[in-house]
Amino acid sequence: MALRIFVTGPAGVGKTTLVERVAREVDRWGYIVGGVITREVRRGGRRIGFKITALDTGEEGTLASLRGTSHLPGVPFGKYVVHVDEIERVAVPAIRRAIVEADLIVIDEIGPMEYTSNEFIRAVGEVLKSEKPLLAVVHRKFIDRFRPLGEVHTLSFENRNAEFGIILDRVMKELKGIRG
C-alpha cells in the first residue's frame, strides 16, 4: 500500500506551513509534487476567506469568502460562502492531474468546506485508490474517517518542527523506494 500521511491539529498550528515545507524539499530533490494548497486570505489582520492554489500550475481560486464579500456563487457555510465551482475549477483538476503526473500528491485540506463538492469527494477517493504517496491536511472533524487509511500526525506548537523532520523522512524514503 502506498504511503498515506494525514496531518491534523488545531487551527493556526502550522499544518499548511508544514505541508508546504515538505513539498518544497521534495521538489528540491527533483520529485514532482502535485495537488492543492489552501491558504487564508486576510485583510487588515482579519480572515476574510480561503484561497486554493494548484501546485503544478499556480492557478488560484477562491475556496470561500465571508458572506457578502464576493460576487461568486456558493453554498452558505457559517459566516462564509463556499464556492463549489472554484473547488471544481481549480482543486479537482489539480488533484486528478497529480494522480497521473506527480510523485507525491498533496491535498490541503480535506474538510467540511471542501466536502461541499461531490467532485472533490470523488477526486479524494481516486487518490486513495491510486498507488501514489499522499500527504494531506485533514480537518479535525474528519480525521477519524481517515485514521484507518494511513498515518495520522497530530501537530502541536511543541512538536511541529520535529514532525516536519519525521514526515519529510517518511516521504523521501517512500519516494526513493519507488524510483529505486
Swiss-Prot record:
List of residues binding ATP: 9-16, 104-111
Domain of life where this protein originates: Archaea
Any Pfam family the entry gives: NTPase_1
SMART domains in the record: AAA
Molecular function per GO: ATP binding; ATP hydrolysis activity
Reactions catalysed: a ribonucleoside 5'-triphosphate + H2O = a ribonucleoside 5'-diphosphate + phosphate + H(+)
EC number from the UniProt entry: 3.6.1.15
InterPro entries to which the protein is assigned, alphabetical: AAA+_ATPase, Nuc-triphosphatase_THEP1, P-loop_NTPase
Broadest EC class assigned to this enzyme: hydrolase
Keyword annotations from UniProtKB, A to Z: ATP-binding, Hydrolase, Nucleotide-binding
HAMAP family: NTPase_1
Similarity remark: Belongs to the THEP1 NTPase family.
Described function: Has nucleotide phosphatase activity towards ATP, GTP, CTP, TTP and UTP. May hydrolyze nucleoside diphosphates with lower efficiency.
The protein, known as: Nucleoside-triphosphatase THEP1
